[in-house]
């Protein structure tokens, strides 16, 4: 990330991130999208995987956005995923204390991504916000379109390759 977004940690204004994930079938091909804003500077990110789940794409959107920041930042991160919001807001603390096991002593699903998200958070002060998906929130709709674009582009690559 270059320009003003790399300078984001220097000022009191937060970096604002909007994320979304998409999946065609669950599991199936999926995509993720993120919009990062700092002042008047904006960056769009997207990607996808051939065989995944919606929850993995939601997590990867947040992870990819946070990993794109080049220095410690204050972040307002918006997601329409209750799974991500609840996981990071309450479940992860017990999972870590229990050796990445659930209350039922079962392995945490998507533990690789939860651990990666946990590591990405160490550099930043993140305030998490939940927004209702497909409810007319402009940035959430744009993140959703990026996720669908990531899904489509990945699906086309997997057919060609």
From Swiss-Prot:
The keyword Transport does not apply. It holds the Pfam family RNase_H. One of its GO terms (biological process) is DNA replication, removal of RNA primer. It is found in: Cytoplasm. Its main location: cytoplasm. The keyword Electron transport does not apply. This is Ribonuclease H. Residues 137-161 are annotated as: Disordered. Binds 1 Mg(2+) ion per subunit. May bind a second metal ion at a regulatory site, or after substrate binding. Gene3D superfamilies: Ribonuclease H-like superfamily/Ribonuclease H (3.30.420.10). One of its GO terms (cellular component) is cytoplasm. Keywords: Cytoplasm, Endonuclease, Hydrolase, Magnesium, Metal-binding, Nuclease. It comes from Rhodopseudomonas palustris (strain HaA2). Signal peptide: none annotated.
């Amino acid at each position: 990330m270059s320009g003003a977004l790399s300078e984001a940690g220097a000022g009191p204004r937060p970096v604002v991130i909007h994320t979304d994930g998409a999946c065609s079938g669950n599991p199936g091909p999926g995509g993720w999208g993120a919009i990062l804003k700092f002042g008047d500077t904006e960056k769009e990110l997207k990607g996808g995987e051939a065989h995944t789940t919606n929850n993995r794409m939601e997590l990867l959107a947040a992870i990819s956005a946070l990993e794109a920041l080049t220095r410690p930042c204050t972040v307002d991160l918006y997601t329409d995923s209750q799974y991500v919001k609840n996981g990071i807001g309450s479940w992860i603390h017990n999972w870590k204390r229990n050796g990445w096991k659930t209350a039922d002593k079962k392995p945490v699903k998507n533990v690789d991504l939860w651990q990666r998200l946990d590591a990405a958070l160490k550099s930043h002060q993140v305030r998490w916000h939940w927004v209702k998906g497909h409810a007319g929130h402009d940035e959430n709709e744009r993140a959703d379109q990026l996720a669908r674009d990531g899904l489509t582009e990945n699906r086309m690559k997997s057919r060609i390759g």
